[in-house]
Amino acid sequence: MAIALTHYEKKSLKLFLGIYLGSSFVLMLVISVLAFNYEKNEKIKMIRMDMDKMASKIASEVIALHMQTHGDYQNALNALISRYKDASIALFDSKKRVLYSNIPESANLIKNHKEAGFFSFRGEYYLLSDETFAHLGVAKMLFKNSKPLHFSSLYRNIVLVFVVAFLCVIGVSVFLGRLFLKPIRNEITRIDHFLKNTTHELNTPMSALVLSLKTLEDNQQHRRIKIAIQRMSFLYRSLSYLVMQDIERESFVLLDLKALIIKENTLFSEMIDYHKLEFKSDLVEVELKAKEQDFISLYSNLLMNAIKYSVMNGYIHIELTHAFLKVKNLGYEIPKDKITELSVRYVRFNSGVLGYGIGLGLVKKVCEKYKMRLEIHSEPSLKGSFYENSFCVQFQG
């Protein structure tokens, strides 16, 4: 049965395949290059062996003819040449003058190669031999490979084998990747079902608690209960957004950000009053095409973060322009080395404040989805030893 992969599983599988296939590709490429060079060198060795055999054979015949001939060396040499007229060969005397040659470039080659040996020139292979020891006046012999050596067929074969083998590796790696992901997928599915069921079951009691807030009398103890319920409600909303977003079918609409922010501010007003915070907002009319729950999650988490980390009798300032949304509060210093970690889920810079460290993680996730940029700054304030902490979402990231 085929396994349908989720977004996170696809990401993990792509990462696994990227590393596995990348390393396999490099390894197979190195092996292919080594194989090509090995086969090429073997062919060149065979050519040299054939040329060495011919050189030894002709040298032995030259020496034998010299021994058998009494002074008539030229005729003996002509007889030898007639037997090897089809071979690519050149004969030279001790002064490097050409005695015979059917190799056009032999005169130039003998000038540049003084020592006997095997060499290549412009893609052709040659052997210079001095085994005749000047018998019959022949001091050196030059041989040329009669059949040009082409490696195109070898190259094609290696490329074909490489492609077929790499396709097999891709198939095996995809199969193994899915196989390894299956038990992880089962566990994630179990946890996911549990979270969604729990979130669904919490909906009714949370709604009842929120509705019952209106019936509580306005005294200090009841205000604390109200604040606790509001925080639970906020946490429930964040949890719902977190676990339900993969099945959410909400469409993109043109949002009135100012109206949404004012609505959220109303929901948090009692909590702001409870912490004795000065609240000020400077909002302009801004429209943004997005999902409503995404923006609500982004703003409500920024605002809740500002409330939690504000000092008593501090302030919260909200600023909305066409370029950015900024939430500022008066609180304690955020160390510069901690700023980059704040948007990591479950990370908090002040462990003395209640929370789970998921708020800015959700903010960052929404920012990435809409290609926005989250900037965090902590600057000294004029009010005592406190700092003004600024969380700014740039709409054009």
UniProtKB/Swiss-Prot annotation:
Mode of membrane association: Multi-pass membrane protein
Main location: membrane
Catalytic activity, EC: 2.7.13.3
InterPro entries, sorted: HATPase_C_sf (IPR036890), His_kinase_dom (IPR005467), HisK_dim/P_dom (IPR003661), HisK_dim/P_sf (IPR036097), TCS_sensor_his_kinase (IPR050428)
Cellular compartments per GO CC: plasma membrane
Record's catalysed reaction(s): ATP + protein L-histidine = ADP + protein N-phospho-L-histidine
Role this protein plays: Member of the two-component regulatory system CrdR/CrdS that induces the transcriptional induction of the copper resistance determinant CrdA in response to increasing concentrations of copper ions. Functions as a sensor protein kinase that phosphorylates CrdR. In turn, CrdR functions as a transcriptional regulator by direct binding to promoter regions of target genes including the crdA promoter or nitric oxide-responsive gene promoters.
Name the UniProt record assigns to this protein: Sensor histidine kinase CrdS
